[in-house]
């Protein structure tokens, strides 16, 4: 995911880059609403709202500021994308790479805005109990990405909790095997300087939630 975005975005002559999942349908005013938010000098990323299943992370209702942008649909200033060298496609294949990118943007002192009027339909499957259906790739890479994010952003307690969970839960055996191989081969991410200034870890994820299931 991140590697493909980097190949297209790094070195681009565009002023704004659109990071958009292939399983979304844009609303008519999506581009105008996101680009207009980026007219503010200190705003580096503008994030779209997802429907019908909105992302639950919180945002400031007055300023629209939020702590990270979902890679489902966000616009980022190309100069900022260039400055942080895009997505970290060395440590993240997909999932949590958007959080990592967002936090590195915030380390620059830039802001991320959630734009409720900029909407995309994000295709999801739910089961008969209205629970989100998660495929193997999402299950695997989201678990691995969450672990690598906690390592890269210096949350040792969270890292230990995740590793213990992966080790004892048979459903995560593939993820634990990959982690063990990374440890053996010295492939774990290096800790980020200044992580305490921007990184947020909560029981539900990487931001405060407006609601929980």
Regions found by a protein language model. Name each.
Residues 115-134, 145-148:
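Active-site donor/metal-binding and catalytic loop motifs
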Residues 5, 29-31, 97:
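Acidic donor-diphosphate engagement hotspot in glycosyltransferases and nucleotidyltransferases
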Residues 34, 74-76, 80-85, 90-119, ...:
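A short, conserved alpha-helix in the catalytic core of glycosyltransferases
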Residues 140-141, 155-213:
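Non-catalytic, C-terminal membrane-associated alpha-helical segments of glycosyltransferases
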Residues 17:
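Short aromatic/hydrophobic "clamp" motif used to bind/position activated sugar donors
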Residues 57-76, 99-100, 130:
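A recurrent flexible, glycine/aromatic-enriched loop bordering the glycosyltransferase active site
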Residues 1-12:
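Glycine-rich, basic loop-to-helix element that forms the pyrophosphate-binding segment
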Residues 24-60:
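Conserved donor NDP-sugar-binding/catalytic core segment of glycosyltransferases
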């Amino acid at each position: 995911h991140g590697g493909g975005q980097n190949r297209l975005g790094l070195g681009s002559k565009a002023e704004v880059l659109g990071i958009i999942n292939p399983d979304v349908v844009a609303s008519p005013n999506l581009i105008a609403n996101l680009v207009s938010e980026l007219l503010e000098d200190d705003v580096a990323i503008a994030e779209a709202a997802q429907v019908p299943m909105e992302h639950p992370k919180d945002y400031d209702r007055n300023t629209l500021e939020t702590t990270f942008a979902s890679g489902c649909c966000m616009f980022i200033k190309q100069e900022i994308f260039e400055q942080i060298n895009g997505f970290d496609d060395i440590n993240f294949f997909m999932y949590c790479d958007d959080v990592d990118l967002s936090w590195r943007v915030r380390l620059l002192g830039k802001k991320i805005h959630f734009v409720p009027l900029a909407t995309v339909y994000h295709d999801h499957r739910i089961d008969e109990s209205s629970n989100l259906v998660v495929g193997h790739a999402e299950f695997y890479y989201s678990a691995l990405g969450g672990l690598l994010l906690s390592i890269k952003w210096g949350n040792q307690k969270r890292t230990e909790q995740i590793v213990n969970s992966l080790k004892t839960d048979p459903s995560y055996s593939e993820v634990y095997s990959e982690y063990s191989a990374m440890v053996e081969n010295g492939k774990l991410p290096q800790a980020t300087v200044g992580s305490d200034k921007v990184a947020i870890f909560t029981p539900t994820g990487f931001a405060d939630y407006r609601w929980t299931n």
